[in-house]
């Protein structure tokens, strides 16, 4: 067991129950934001009919890396932003159209053709692996310590056979020289024999795969590992059992803005507006993913992402309060103990979307180190990435990180920096220089 002592569990109200509700939607989508570095070559047009598993686009920077349709129906929208940047694809579902059938005899080819190869991400760089590459190890994350996240075990138990099958497939993709590690918290998720199970306990970010990789097999430019989430393993198990991609997934719905926080079983890539209709309160902000590192789910971005296991909903109260800085803060959470709440110590806080401050220079305060469990000089690293000193950043350990690993640093930052976006920009610069 590996115990993580540094970090922070945010005491946010609205924890979902383990009740599972089946919720149907009329449309699904695919988000470009799920695939860093993506340069798509479109293989469909608006109005085309697609089967679940049909190819939607290929990453021209990684030939053979396909993103496929999460459901059967017709392409209703291909959404673009500024400078025609690709944002998302929307598909109106039609249950009468049968899904694609895949040949599973060649595991690697099956994963590539089905689009499930894109479930893997690399460390360093947090990208889909280059087709034909081989990792030093594969890490399966069956542990989640994000705020409002339900235990993966509560979902795996509904899909145990698929999860076990997925682990077996992944462990046999390469020769035995590529070990497969599976993290868990409290309860072992499977009894598959050829998997190295690692128990992680402690505060968030104990449940992030970056933390698990750091304490198991740290990465470098010469040592690359692949990572994958537990629901993606379940989907792979389903594919190799049935020959079809998995059309549904589980996503928890939690936060103060939800009437009845619970787990929803819905279509993969579900339209979040349709999924949450009648379930959330007025004047709420819907976040696809964690409150720490999710994206605002609105307009053409309102879909459950490929790697999202939760939807978080907070009261959207961004208006400034007069003399808020002088208030005792009995209902505000502070990692630094700056408010009266540090003495009252309520068990849960009602969080909203206000950031309670504005941008200013980085101040070297203890919270950065206190929430960073990795063997990294946090303050120095943050300064390096803000100034885009990539050489210093590499020396300080930036290659071990993905944006989610700096979410707590952004949360405790009195200077209100978005370190996750800044880190991604640095990783892109380093990757391009290497290329």
Spans of model-derived segments:
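Short, surface-exposed secondary-structure edge patches
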Residues: 40-41, 45-48, 64-67, 160, ...
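N-terminal, Lys/Arg-enriched amphipathic/low-complexity engagement segments
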Residues: 1-43, 58, 90, 197-200
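Generic structural signal for buried aliphatic residues
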Residues: 50, 56-57, 264, 272
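Generic structural motif
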Residues: 34-38, 50-53, 62-77
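Buried, small/hydrophobic-residue-enriched core segments of structured protein domains
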Residues: 65, 72, 78-435
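A short N-terminal beta->alpha junction/helix N-cap motif
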Residues: 38-45, 154-155, 414
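Acidic, glycine-anchored pre-beta loop/turn
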Residues: 44-53, 79-82, 243
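Glycine-/proline-rich flexible loop or hinge segments
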Residues: 52-60, 95-99
């Amino acid at each position: 067991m590996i115990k993580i002592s540094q970090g922070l569990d945010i005491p946010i109200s609205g924890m979902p129950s383990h009740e599972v509700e089946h919720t149907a939607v009329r449309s699904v989508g695919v988000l470009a934001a799920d695939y860093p570095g993506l340069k798509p070559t479109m293989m469909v047009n608006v109005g085309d009919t697609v089967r679940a598993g049909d190819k939607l686009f290929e990453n021209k920077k990684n030939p053979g890396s396909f993103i496929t349709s999460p459901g059967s129906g017709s392409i209703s929208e291909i959404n673009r932003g500024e400078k025609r940047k690709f944002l998302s694809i929307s598909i109106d579902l039609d249950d009468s159209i049968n899904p694609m059938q895949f040949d599973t005899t060649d595991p690697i080819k099956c994963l590539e053709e089905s689009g499930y190869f894109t479930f893997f991400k690399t460390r360093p760089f947090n990208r889909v692996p280059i087709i034909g590459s081989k990792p030093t190890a594969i890490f399966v994350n069956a542990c989640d310590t994000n705020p409002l996240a339900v235990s993966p075990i509560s979902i795996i138990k509904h899909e145990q056979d698929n999860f076990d099958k997925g682990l077996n497939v992944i462990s046999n993709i390469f020769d035995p020289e590529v070990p497969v590690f599976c993290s868990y918290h409290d309860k072992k998720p499977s009894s598959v024999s050829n998997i190295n199970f690692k128990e992680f306990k402690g505060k968030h970010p104990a449940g992030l795969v970056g933390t698990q990789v750091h304490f198991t097999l740290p990465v470098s430019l010469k040592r690359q590992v692949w990572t994958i989430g537990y629901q993606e393993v379940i989907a792979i198990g389903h594919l190799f059992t049935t020959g079809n991609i998995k059309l549904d997934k589980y996503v928890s719905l939690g936060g103060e803005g939800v009437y009845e926080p619970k787990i929803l079983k819905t279509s993969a890539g579900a339209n979040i507006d349709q999924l949450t209709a009648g379930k959330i309160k007025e004047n709420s902000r819907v976040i696809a993913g964690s409150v720490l590192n999710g994206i605002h789910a609105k307009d053409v971005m309102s879909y459950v992402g490929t790697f999202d296991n939760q939807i978080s909903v907070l009261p959207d109260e961004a208006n400034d309060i007069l003399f808020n800085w002088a208030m005792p803060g009995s209902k505000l959470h502070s990692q630094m103990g700056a408010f009266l709440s540090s003495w009252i110590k309520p068990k849960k806080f009602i969080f909203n979307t206000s950031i309670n401050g504005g941008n200013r220079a980085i101040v070297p305060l203890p919270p950065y180190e206190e929430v960073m469990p990795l063997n990294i000089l946090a303050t120095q690293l943050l300064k390096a990435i803000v100034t885009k000193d990539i050489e210093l950043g590499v020396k300080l350990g930036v290659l071990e990180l993905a944006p989610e690993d700096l979410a707590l640093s952004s949360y405790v930052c009195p200077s209100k920096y978005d370190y996750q976006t800044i880190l991604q920009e640095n990783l892109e610069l380093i990757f391009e220089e290497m290329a």
